[in-house]
């Protein structure tokens, strides 16, 4: 079963330089991907999709969790992701602008990230 991962930049609207932040995120993600063993590599690497969101697909939950942990530990101060993980079938829907990822795995990941976001909104800064 595939594992869908959504990553959302925490506080992206408050970042002083969103463009520079994305460059740093891209570099950190590339570093983590290079350093992970082949057995933990994503099937589809973590890449931006829209706004401050990114998506990846992993073969196992172990691989997804290892990637997420390493990514969080590698991010510099001031940059943070929140994650949603969904386990289940995923597929692509053809579009004139490229394939769109869809399916129960993505729906579960979206539901998970929505729960995390709602809980973070209720915390004291």
Q: Residue ranges of each PLM-predicted region?
A:
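Regulatory and interdomain segments flanking nucleotide-handling catalytic cores
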Residues: 1-125
């Amino acid at each position: 079963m595939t594992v869908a991962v959504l990553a959302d930049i925490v506080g992206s609207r408050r970042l002083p330089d969103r463009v520079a932040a994305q460059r740093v995120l891209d570099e950190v993600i590339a570093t983590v991907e290079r350093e992970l063993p082949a057995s933990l590599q994503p099937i589809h690497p973590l890449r931006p999709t829209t706004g401050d969101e990114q998506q990846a697909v992993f073969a196992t939950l172990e691989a997804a969790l290892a990637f997420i942990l390493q990514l969080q530990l590698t991010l510099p101060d001031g940059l943070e992701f929140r994650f949603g993980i969904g386990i289940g079938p995923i597929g692509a829907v053809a579009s004139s602008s490229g394939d769109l990822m869809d399916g129960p795995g993505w729906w579960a990941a979206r539901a998970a990230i929505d729960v995390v976001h709602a809980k973070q909104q209720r915390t004291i800064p």
